[in-house]
C-alpha cells in the first residue's frame, strides 16, 4: 500500500532505446524487476525489425536525442532502497535472466504478434506485443498479487509478471496499484479478476511453459466480452482511448463488511429480518437516537391541555360560584321588592304620621285616618284666618276683610299672637295672595319665592 505514495521523487529519468537493425518480425523485450521498485521499459518501434538486445540508458533529468518521437520518457517511481542503490545491477541481472522459452503465435491479422519469454529460475513471464502500424506501445506488468499497465494514445493489454510490485504508468502519470483489482474493471478477488483479463496465480500463467494466444477479429470489444480461462489472457485487439485509464489515484476498493459495520448502528435489524416494515416511530428511534427525547414532548403537550382544561374548569367553577353569589343578591332584591315587608313599613310610617297629625289637630279626637284628615283641614283653615287677622294692620287692602271678621276671631288672634310670635311664625293671609279659586292647589301650596305667580 505504501508504494503508490512514492512518486517522481527519485530525481532520475531512464529510457529504453533499441538499436535499429533489419529484422523479420516485430517484437519487444520487457524485463521485470524483482525488488519493490517499478520501472517502465519501452523500445523504439520499427516496421521491419526484430527485437534485439535492448540496453537501458540512464540519464539525469534530461531527454535522449535519439528518436524523440518514438520514445517514451517516463518518470521513475521510487521503490525500496535496493532499487535506488543498485538499479543498474538489477537491470543487468534481469537482462541475463531473459528468454529460456519463447512462444510466438501469429494472429489472423498480420498487424499484431505476441512473443512470450519466460524465465525458469525466477518464474518471471514477459508478454511482448508490437503493432507495426502504431508508434506507441503500452505494456502491462503483472505480479502475483499486484497488476499494472502502461498506456499511451492507444491501448493494447499485455501482461508480464514481476515478483514484488507493479506500476501503472500513463503518459507521465505513474500510479502504483497495490490492490488486486484491475483498472477499469469490476470488483476482484485475490485469486481471480474480472475486467481486462482474468488470471489464475496458482501456477504462474499456466501449467505449461508456453502461452497460447487468441485471434483478435473484432475492432471493439467491451469489458464484459472477455472471459476467464485457466492460464489464458483474453485481450483486446482494437485500441481503446487512453483517457479511460488516466487516473491519478488507484480505483476505490470494494466496500468490505467492516466498512458497513461502521454504519450498522443506523440500520434497523428488525427491518432487514422481517418482511414487514416497522412502525415509523420505531424506525425513527433506531435511525436517529437523538430524536427520542421529542417523544416526551407529546406527553407534555397532552399535559398542557389538561392543565388548561383544569384552569378552565376552575374558572368556570369560580364563575358559577360568583353567579351563585350574585343570584342570591338578586333574589333578595326581588324578594324585598315583592315581599310585603316594605309596604308594611310604609304603612307603619304612614300610621305614625297620621298619629302625629292627630296629636296636632285633635289630640283627643278620633284616631282613624279619615277623621284625622278632616280635623287637619279644619285646623288649617283656622290657622289661615288667624294669619289674615294678624296681617291686616300691615296690609292696606286687608281693611275690608277685617270688618267682615267676627269678634271671636279677633279674640283668638290676640290670644294666639304671643304663641305665634314666640314660635317665630311669619304667616301671610290668604287674601293678600293670589286667589286660590283661580289657581291650582299645587301652585297655591307651593308658590315660587322671589317671583310672580302664573
UniProtKB/Swiss-Prot annotation:
Biased composition range(s): Polar residues: 185-195, 207-228
Occurrences of domain bHLH (ranges): 334-383
Cell location: Nucleus
Assigned keywords, A-Z: DNA-binding, Nucleus, Transcription, Transcription regulation
Alphabetized InterPro entries for the sequence: bHLH95_bHLH, bHLH_dom, HLH_DNA-bd_sf, IND-like
Ranges of compositional bias, category Low complexity: 101-113
Segments of this protein annotated with the region Disordered: 101-127, 185-228, 270-348, 398-417
SUPFAM superfamilies named among the record's database cross-references: HLH, helix-loop-helix DNA-binding domain
Main location: nucleus
UniProt biased composition (Basic and acidic residues): 303-324
Keyword hit for Aminoacyl-tRNA synthetase: no
Gene Ontology cellular-component annotations: nucleus
GO MF, one example: protein dimerization activity
Subunit structure of this chain's protein: Homodimer.
Protein name: Transcription factor bHLH123
Source species: Arabidopsis thaliana (Mouse-ear cress)
Amino acid at each position: 500500500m505504501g508504494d503508490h505514495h512514492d512518486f517522481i521523487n527519485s530525481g532520475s529519468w531512464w529510457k529504453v532505446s533499441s538499436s535499429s537493425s533489419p529484422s523479420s518480425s516485430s517484437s519487444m523485450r520487457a524485463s521485470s524487476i524483482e525488488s519493490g521498485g517499478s520501472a517502465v521499459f519501452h523500445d523504439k518501434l520499427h516496421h521491419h525489425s526484430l527485437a534485439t538486445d535492448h540496453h537501458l540508458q540512464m540519464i539525469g533529468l534530461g531527454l535522449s536525442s535519439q528518436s524523440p518521437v518514438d520514445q517514451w520518457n517516463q518518470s521513475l517511481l521510487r521503490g525500496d532502497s535496493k532499487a535506488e542503490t543498485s538499479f543498474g545491477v538489477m537491470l543487468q541481472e534481469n537482462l541475463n535472466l531473459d528468454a529460456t522459452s519463447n512462444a510466438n503465435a501469429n494472429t489472423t491479422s498480420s498487424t499484431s504478434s505476441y512473443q512470450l519469454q519466460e524465465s525458469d529460475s525466477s518464474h518471471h513471464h514477459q508478454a511482448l506485443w508490437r503493432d507495426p502500424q502504431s508508434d506507441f506501445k503500452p505494456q502491462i506488468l503483472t505480479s502475483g498479487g499486484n497488476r499494472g499497465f502502461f498506456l499511451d494514445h492507444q491501448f493494447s493489454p499485455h501482461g508480464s509478471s514481476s515478483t514484488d510490485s507493479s506500476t501503472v504508468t500513463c503518459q507521465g502519470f505513474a500510479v502504483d496499484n497495490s490492490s488486486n483489482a484491475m483498472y477499469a474493471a469490476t470488483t476482484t478477488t485475490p485469486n481471480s479478476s474480472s475486467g481486462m483479463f482474468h488470471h489464475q496465480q496458482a501456477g504462474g500463467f499456466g501449467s505449461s511453459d508456453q502461452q497460447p494466444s487468441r485471434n483478435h477479429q473484432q475492432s471493439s470489444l467491451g469489458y464484459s466480452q472477455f472471459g476467464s480461462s485457466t492460464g489464458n489472457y483474453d485481450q483486446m485487439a482494437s485500441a481503446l482511448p487512453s483517457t479511460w485509464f488516466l487516473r491519478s489515484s488507484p480505483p476505490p476498493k470494494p466496500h468490505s463488511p467492516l466498512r458497513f459495520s461502521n454504519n450498522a448502528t443506523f440500520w434497523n435489524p428488525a427491518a432487514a429480518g422481517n418482511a414487514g416494515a416497522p412502525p415509523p416511530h420505531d424506525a425513527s428511534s433506531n435511525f436517529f437516537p437523538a430524536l427520542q427525547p421529542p417523544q416526551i414532548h407529546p406527553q407534555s403537550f397532552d399535559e398542557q391541555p389538561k392543565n388548561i382544561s383544569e384552569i378552565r374548569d376552575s374558572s368556570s367553577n369560580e364563575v358559577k360560584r360568583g353567579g351563585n353569589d350574585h343570584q342570591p343578591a338578586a333574589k333578595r332584591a326581588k324578594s324585598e321588592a315583592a315581599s310585603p315587608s316594605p309596604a308594611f313599613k310604609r304603612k307603619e310610617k304612614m300610621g305614625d304620621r297620621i298619629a302625629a297629625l292627630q296629636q296636632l289637630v285633635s289630640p283627643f279626637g278620633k284616631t282613624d285616618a279619615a277623621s284625622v284628615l278632616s280635623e287637619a283641614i279644619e285646623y288649617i283653615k283656622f290657622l289661615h284666618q288667624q294669619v289674615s287677622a294678624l296681617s291686616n294692620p300691615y296690609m292696606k287692602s286687608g281693611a275690608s276683610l277685617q270688618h267682615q271678621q267676627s269678634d271671636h276671631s279677633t279674640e283668638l288672634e290676640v290670644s294666639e299672637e304671643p304663641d305665634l310670635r314666640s314660635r317665630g311664625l311669619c304667616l301671610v293671609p290668604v287674601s293678600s295672595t293670589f286667589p286660590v279659586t283661580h289657581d291650582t292647589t299645587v301652585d297655591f301650596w307651593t308658590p315660587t319665592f322671589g317671583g310672580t305667580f302664573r
